Design a protein with these regions (language model features):
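Conserved pre-motif I regulatory segment
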Residues: 1-42
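Residue-level recognition of well-ordered secondary-structure positions
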Residues: 25, 57-60, 101
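Walker A/P-loop NTP-binding motif
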Residues: 32-33, 52-65, 82-86
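Walker A/P-loop
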Residues: 36-55
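A substrate-engagement module of RecA-like helicase motors
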Residues: 1-14, 65-142
Length: 142
C-alpha cells in the first residue's frame, strides 16, 4: 500500500503532477493499520498534506466496507465526483462504491402522498407542483 505513494508508485504513474509527500505516506500507513485492526482513527493534517488520497488509497485497497464521512456536501461531491474516480483509476480498483446522504436530502414519499391527498387545502400552483413532483418521484430510482 505505501508503495502507492512512492516516487514510482501507482499514484505517481497514473496521476499527472502527483508528488509523494512523507506526511501523506505516514497518514496512509496509519489509515491502513486502523482499517486492518478495525479501529477508529482521527487524523489532523495541514493543508497540502494530501489527506484525501492518504485515506482513499488504503480504503480502496482494504477490500472491506469503509465509511468516509465529510463535513459538507460540497466536499462529499468533490470526493465522489473527482478524487474517488482518480484514485480508483490509478489503483485499478474494480469494487463497488456508494454515495449516501442524510435523509434530509431525499424526498419523503409518505409526506408527498399526504400533501397530494390534502390537495383541496392547497393553492392551485402548489397543488400543480405536488402533482408534477409525484409523477417525477415514480420515475426516479435514487
Amino acid at each position: 500500500m505505501t508503495d502507492d505513494f512512492a516516487q514510482d508508485g501507482q499514484l505517481a504513474k497514473a496521476i499527472p503532477g502527483f508528488k509523494p509527500r512523507e506526511p501523506q505516506r505516514q497518514m496512509a500507513v496509519a489509515v491502513t493499520q486502523a482499517i486492518e485492526k478495525g479501529q477508529p482513527l482521527v487524523v489532523e493534517a495541514g493543508t497540502g498534506t494530501g489527506k484525501t488520497y492518504a485515506y482513499l488509497a488504503p480504503a480502496l485497497r482494504a477490500k472491506k466496507k469503509v465509511i468516509i464521512s465529510t463535513g459538507s456536501k460540497a466536499l462529499q461531491d468533490q470526493l465522489y465526483s473527482r478524487d474517488l474516480p482518480t484514485v480508483s483509476k490509478a489503483l485499478k480498483y474494480t469494487g463497488n462504491v456508494a454515495l449516501l446522504k442524510g435523509r434530509s436530502n431525499y424526498l419523503c414519499l409518505e409526506r408527498l402522498e399526504q400533501q397530494a391527498l390534502a390537495g383541496g387545502d392547497l393553492p392551485v400552483q402548489i397543488l400543480s407542483d405536488v402533482i408534477l413532483l409525484r409523477s417525477w418521484s415514480n420515475q426516479t430510482v435514487d
